[in-house]
Swiss-Prot record:
SUPFAM superfamilies, per the entry: ADP-ribosylation (SSF56399), Ankyrin repeat (SSF48403), SAM/Pointed domain (SSF47769)
Organism phylogeny: Eukaryota, Metazoa, Chordata, Craniata, Vertebrata
Keyword Cytoplasm: yes
Name of the featured protein: Poly [ADP-ribose] polymerase tankyrase-1
Sequence segments annotated as region (Disordered): 1-91, 112-173
Length: 1327
């Protein structure tokens, strides 16, 4: 569903306009003739402006020619010479018939009316550019523009209103009538692609009408030339002639090819257009496409049988005239590497887009010089191999080492590919340069099944390679060596039997191979001998039978040698088979006897012989036919004469006892001879038919155990299973199926047992049959499937018969009851094979059916199943904005960063479709906003809404953001901050009344106390007075740290830089003006803005940026924050699943966050809360973990990042325990873990957490889940208190971002817990 927009990323159609200049692909023109073509002797060619006509016409007039001005010279003239009067005649432009919009009066006009002389050639066209008409006057837009319109009237174009239309018309004064108004309107509609007008105007009478005033083009010429696919389709439906020719001999296909309309070309070819049609100058459509460089069209033409060797009247082939861009297609080199890669990787779509007869056997330019077939065969791409073979791939092609594709397939054991290649004539004993055969390859790699296949096609295991080794020698196991020898002997015997070569049979015959079966067909030597056309087949048959051949052995179709002999009327060997005990009534897979086969073939004498041997003519096949019914009139006559006409008394009593369920009588009467007797006076039913139809379970069981035939058919072709199913006898049906009854057998009306059960509403029977492979798509003689026969309202059976489709439909429609009834462990992940290959969960997720999705997930649905586009259910939910579904899928551990075939993640989907809440949910659970799709786009690149863009920018790490979005934070080392140097932006500190212990002693505004390591007041020599920073930090603050090496090499400090100008900076190698300007202005602002002792900090505070003050580890403030963090580690109920397993942090860095704007916003909100809460703002220092930390320190807390699915709704969550916040660092529940290792318990990667000032104000105490978007009325926050079945530790939730200030940014690692022994040792050492 969500993938329907993919095509826009992969297909971009570019329409190339015709150029007025002569094309480079035109053949060199011959010397100009004495007269300009198309002008009367003694006539001076008129200039384009003289007649008001453009020098060439545009493609919109329905005709495309590869060269000349759009017309063809008479056959006896050179083609398209330059005009003798020097006017610019374009040798490669095309003339298209022009249709004037105004009515044309069919009157005779003098030649002076348009300034054009009559055409003496009589071809209806002129070669002079001055004779080409244009849709507009010479001052209008270029005729090559496809969008330009027709002239409003002939006079507007400088042509007399009485002149005929178009350049293809005879000159004025010739008396040719003008085109009728209705036809003109039709041609104009075809040209413009107005399909509704075309449908209104076209009919059988005018669909092939010619533009008699122009080039005699048909409407199809116009529509094809302009690429109007819809119009072309309609015209073809109306009977348009794809072979219609205009004056120049062009068919519509020429036009479509000339202008590169590949879809129209395909359409015309599919409708029978001749790809090798020649115009009057023997130009084919391929000439046209090649000259114009229409690569796609060239490929389509070649794929449809275009002959690249056809030459025009000048003796030029398409390759000779091809534009350079198209030459590669005609040499087979076009995108050869891509074609080979498509064959290797199995990319059918790509392969078929490039494959032509010219490149189907191309060889790679490097490596092994493989062909596409070599690669497809070696990589087991069965479908690709099929396609290549269908399109003429050479099975004998050799690579650099002399290997044929069969070598590759056999070497890697690809059975199906090997079979395909052999079927298409691959040489089974082909040798490479080292004389290795495919059998050598297969045997040496122990490809047992492939070896058998090769041997069955004549592979010789005795052939030796260049090392003198045979395939048998190279077999790695004794078992394979023995098998190769055995099968080779067996196949040799089969071949000798086929040839009825008595001497060879005697030579190869051995006891162990007498009943050897061909692995694929299961034929024995006896089958081969009786089928042989050679005269000694009888002697060979006798020899084989004497030596122990099984006379009743069956091949894969269950045919005995007697079946084979009878079918071929080999009566001589039938006699031998009968003498050696052949079963006369053995059945093949179709339930046919040898008599059926002989009757079907019309062998009268064979039928007589079989009847004399005891064949039963009353046996009914699985299709419901007796032998007589399958034979001709003569066969029917002799068979009907021998058919018994009444049932014996014993048989009659047995049939009645079976019907009545009289088991004792059945036991007395039943024998192996009459267990399958027939009710000859009735329906020819057997005892089993009666017992099954009357639900006599015990009788059915007894008959089955004593040889009753479950496949026996009555007169109507019904088997016992039909009877049981029709009457709903479940136990009997189950018995019959268990004893091998065919669930898909059909009667004479092609009703299967499933038809019977469905029509009678037998739900359980239908279920049983389907479970055992019944085909619900089979149709009866009336074309009805079992589903069509279900009674209206019987929805349970309807759903059952629809099978997977019903479950998919129920999931799509959100019908939980149907889903519960239909869902089984076998079909819970079934696929919509007619659509996107979606699972029920895909559909439930895409259609927002929460209850269905939950049921499917609870019962084992695959949460990460991919459809044919690679989308998982979360893609669907994200694409359509179904937040609850997405949350449910995440709960069941779906992959939030799963990618489809185009590398789109669910976050890409949500961002592109403007799903804000979905983006927040995905990001909160670890979605990676930096992942790129195949086109290199991140979700941010696809975001359509401003709030989503802001959300994604906040979630992305700074290094992944585009430069324009990167927040600039200044990091200042602790050593640069003196006690008195606190910037003004830190002075607005709030109280920390609620803090106790070491944290309560922290000075809010300062970074350290007076005794904690400051830089001192003394300055080093050479520093600018009052500056507490070095040149490296200054460059970093400007984003110019890459210039540091230059400054260090030249020993330039800040005081030296302060005296430098543009010229001096340029001399030391800083050539970019922008860099020099930034340096000079930066120093000026730095010096001009000094306040206190640290003007650098003041400067940045003025600019409202964020400053990160590095605290020194020995600083009391650092130590207090670390102690608070370490001391609040707790053990959580999830056992470390979310935040990792640890008992201590390794604190790497603690930075104080300074941002004047955020501080002021926090203080303002704190004041509001205090006023609303009796002057108590209730501030706490709390921890916060989030994937948005980088955004928070720059922009503050943003409630848009919140997810409504949290325990207390869409709030911002804080904790007094650092280990609780650690669980959210990579997202809710730990997200997907660290970005590098995808590990929630990673001990390597650095993490970041915030220690924040939070104004709680009046808090609402809550013990259970409550979804809120805002704080409860009269309250400013929610405190989730611990309870028995609720929270283990308290959570603090605010719903306005300005109620918290990120005071400290802590960078840390979790530490792996020490082993107990190590802990004990450490404790002892400490003691």
């Amino acid at each position: 569903m969500a993938a329907s927009r993919r095509s826009q990323h992969h297909h971009h159609h570019h329409q190339q306009q015709l150029q007025p200049a002569p094309g480079a692909s035109a053949p060199p023109p011959p010397p100009p003739p004495p007269l300009s073509p198309g002008l009367a002797p003694g006539t001076t060619p008129a200039s384009p402006t003289a007649s008001g006509l453009a020098p060439f016409a545009s493609p919109r007039h329905g005709l495309a020619l590869p060269e000349g001005d759009g017309s063809r010279d008479p056959p006896d003239r050179p083609r398209s010479p330059d005009p003798v009067d020097g006017t610019s005649c374009c040798s490669t432009t095309s003339t298209i018939c022009t249709v004037a919009a105004a009515p044309v009066v069919p009157a005779v006009s003098t030649s002076s009316a348009a300034g054009v002389a009559p055409n003496p050639a009589g071809s209806g066209s002129n070669n002079s550019p001055s004779s080409s008409s244009s849709p507009t006057s010479s001052s209008s837009s270029s005729p090559s523009s496809p969008g330009s319109s027709l002239a409003e009237s002939p006079e507007a174009a400088g042509v007399s209103s009485t002149a005929p239309l178009g350049p293809g018309a005879a000159g004025p004064g010739t008396g040719v009538p003008a085109v009728s108004g209705a036809l003109r309107e039709l041609l104009e509609a075809c040209r413009n692609g107005d399909v509704s007008r075309v449908k209104r105007l076209v009919d059988a009478a005018n669909v092939n009408a010619k533009d008699m005033a122009g080039r005699k083009s048909s409407p199809l010429h116009f529509a094809a030339g302009f690429g109007r696919k819809d119009v072309v389709e309609h015209l073809l439906q109306m009977g348009a002639n794809v072979h219609a020719r205009d004056d120049g001999g062009l068919i519509p296909l020429h036009n479509a090819c000339s202008f590169g309309h590949a879809e129209v070309v395909s359409l015309l070819l599919c409708q029978g257009a001749d790809p090798n049609a020649r115009d009057n100058w023997n130009y084919t459509p391929l000439h046209e496409a090649a000259i114009k460089g229409k690569i796609d069209v060239c490929i389509v033409l070649l794929q449809h049988g275009a002959d690249p060797n056809i030459r025009n009247t000048d003796g030029k082939s398409a390759l000779d005239l091809a534009d350079p861009s198209a030459k590669a297609v005609l040499t087979g080199e076009y995108k050869k590497d891509e074609l080979l890669e498509a064959a290797r990787s199995g990319n059918e779509e790509k392969l078929m887009a490039l494959l032509t007869p010219l490149n189907v056997n191309c060889h790679a330019s490097d490596g092994r010089k493989s062909t596409p077939l070599h690669l497809a065969a070696g990589y087991n791409r069965v479908r690709i191999v099929q396609l290549l073979l269908q399109h003429g791939a050479d099975v004998h092609a050799k690579d650099k080492g002399g290997l044929v594709p069969l070598h590759n397939a056999c070497s890697y054991g690809h059975y199906e590919v090997t079979e395909l290649l052999l079927k298409h004539g691959a040489c089974v004993n082909a040798m490479d340069l080292w004389q290795f055969t495919p059998l050598h390859e297969a045997a040496s790699k122990n490809r047992v099944e492939v070896c058998s296949l090769l041997l069955s096609h004549g592979a010789d295991p005795t052939l030796v390679n260049c090392h003198g080794k045979s395939a048998v020698d190279m077999a790695p196991t004794p078992e394979l060596r023995e098998r190769l020898t055995y099968e080779f002997k067996g196949h040799s015997l089969l071949q000798a039997a086929r040839e009825a070569d008595l001497a060879k049979v005697k030579k190869t015959l051995a006891l162990e191979i007498i009943n050897f079966k061909q692995p694929q067909s299961h034929e024995t030597a006896l089958h081969c001998a009786v089928a042989s056309l050679h005269p000694k087949r009888k002697q060979v048959t006798e020899l084989l039978l004497r030596k122990g051949a099984n006379v009743n052995e069956k091949n894969k179709d269950f045919m005995t040698p007697l079946h084979v002999a009878a079918e071929r009327a080999h009566n001589d060997v039938m006699e031998v088979l009968h003498k050696h005990g052949a079963k006369m009534n053995a059945l093949d897979t179709l339930g046919q006897t040898a008599l059926h086969r002989a009757a079907l073939a019309g062998h009268l004498q064979t039928c007589r012989l079989l009847l004399s041997y005891g064949s039963d003519p009353s046996i009914i096949s699985l299709q419901g036919f007796t032998a007589a019914q399958m034979g001709n009139e003569a066969v029917q006559q002799i068979l009907s004469e021998s058919t018994p006409i009444r049932t014996s008394d014993v048989d009659y009593r047995l049939l009645e006892a079976s019907k009545a369920g009289d088991l004792e009588t059945v036991k007395q009467l039943c024998s192996s001879q009459n267990v399958n007797c027939r009710d000859l006076e009735g329906r020819h039913s057997t005892p089993l038919h009666f017992a099954a139809g009357y639900n006599r379970v015990s009788v059915v069981e007894y008959l089955l155990h004593h040889g009753a035939d479950v496949h026996a058919k009555d007169k109507g072709g019904l088997v016992p299973l039909h009877n049981a199913c029709s009457y709903g006898h479940y136990e009997v049906a189950e018995l019959l199926v268990r004893h091998g009854a065919s669930v898909n057998v059909a009667d004479l009306w092609k009703f299967t047992p499933l038809h019977e059960a469905a029509a009678k509403g037998k739900y359980e029977i239908c279920k049983l049959l389907l479970k055992h492979g019944a085909d619900p798509t089979k149709k009866n003689r009336d074309g009805n499937t079992p589903l069509d026969l279900v009674k209206e309202g019987d929805t349970d059976i309807q759903d059952l018969l629809r099978g997977d489709a019903a479950l998919l439909d129920a999931a799509k429609k959100g019908c939980l009851a149907r889903v519960q009834k239909l869902c089984t462990p076998e079909n819970i992940n079934c696929r919509d094979t007619q659509g996107r290959n979606s699972t029920p969960l895909h559909l439930a997720a895409g259609y927002n059916n929460l209850e269905v999705a939950e049921y499917l997930l609870e019962h084992g649905a695959d949460v990460n199943a991919q459809d044919k586009g690679g989308l998982i259910p979360l893609h669907n939910a994200a694409s359509y904005g179904h937040v609850d579904i997405a949350a449910l899928l995440i709960k069941y551990n779906t992959c939030v960063n799963a990618t489809d075939k185009w590398a789109f993640t669910p976050l890409h989907e949500a961002a592109q479709k403007g799903r804000t809440q979905l983006c927040a949910l995905l990001l909160a659970h670890g979605a990676d906003p930096t992942m790129k799709n195949q086109e290199g786009q991140t979700p941010l690149d696809l975001a359509t809404a401003d709030d989503i863009r802001a959300l994604l920018i906040d979630a992305m790490p700074p290094e992944a953001l585009p430069t324009c979005f990167k927040p600039q934070a200044t990091v200042v080392s602790a050593s640069l901050i003196s006690p008195a140097s606190t910037p003004s932006c830190l002075s607005a500190a709030s109280s920390i009344d609620n803090l106790t212990g070491p944290l309560a002693e922290l000075a809010v505004g300062g970074a350290s106390n007076a005794g904690d390591g400051a830089a001192g007041t003394e300055r080093k020599e050479g520093e600018v007075a009052g500056l507490d920073m070095n040149i490296s930090q200054f460059l970093k603050s400007l984003g110019l740290e890459h210039l540091r090496d230059i400054f260090e090499t030249e020993q330039i400090t800040l005081d030296v830089l302060a005296d430098m100008g543009h010229e001096e900076l340029k001399e030391i190698g800083i050539n970019a003006y922008g860099h020099r300007h930034k340096l000079i202005k930066g120093v000026e602002r730095l010096l001009g803005g000094q306040q206190g002792t640290n003007p650098y900090l003041t400067f940045h505070c003025v600019n409202q940026g964020t400053i990160l003050l590095d605290l020194a580890p020995e600083d009391k403030e650092y130590q207090s924050v670390e102690e608070e963090m370490q001391s609040t580690i707790r053990e959580h109920r999830d056992g470390g699943n979310a935040g990792g397993i640890f008992n201590r942090y390794n604190v790497i860095r603690i930075q104080k966050v300074v941002n004047k704007k955020l501080r002021e916003r926090f203080c303002h909100r704190q004041k509001e809360v205090s006023e609303e809460n009796h002057n108590h703002h209730n501030e706490r220092m709390l921890f916060h973990g989030s994937p948005f930390i980088n955004a928070i320190i720059h922009k503050g807390f943003d409630e848009r990042h919140a997810y409504i699915g949290g325990m207390f709704g869409a709030g911002i969550y804080f904790a007094e325990n650092s280990s609780k916040s650690n669980q959210y660092v990579y997202g809710i529940g730990g997200g997907t873990g660290c970005p590098t290792h995808k590990d929630r318990s990673c001990y390597i990667c650095h993490r970041q957490m915030l220690f924040c000032r939070v104004t709680l104000g009046k808090s609402f105490l809550q013990f259970s889940t409550m979804k809120m978007a805002h704080a409860p009325p009269g309250h400013h926050s929610v405190i989730g208190r611990p309870s028995v079945n609720g929270l283990a530790y308290a959570e603090y939730v605010i719903y306005r971002g300005e109620q918290a200030y990120p005071e400290y940014l802590i960078t840390y690692q979790i530490m792996k817990p020490e082993a107990p022994s190590q802990t004990a040792t450490a404790a002892e050492q400490k003691t």
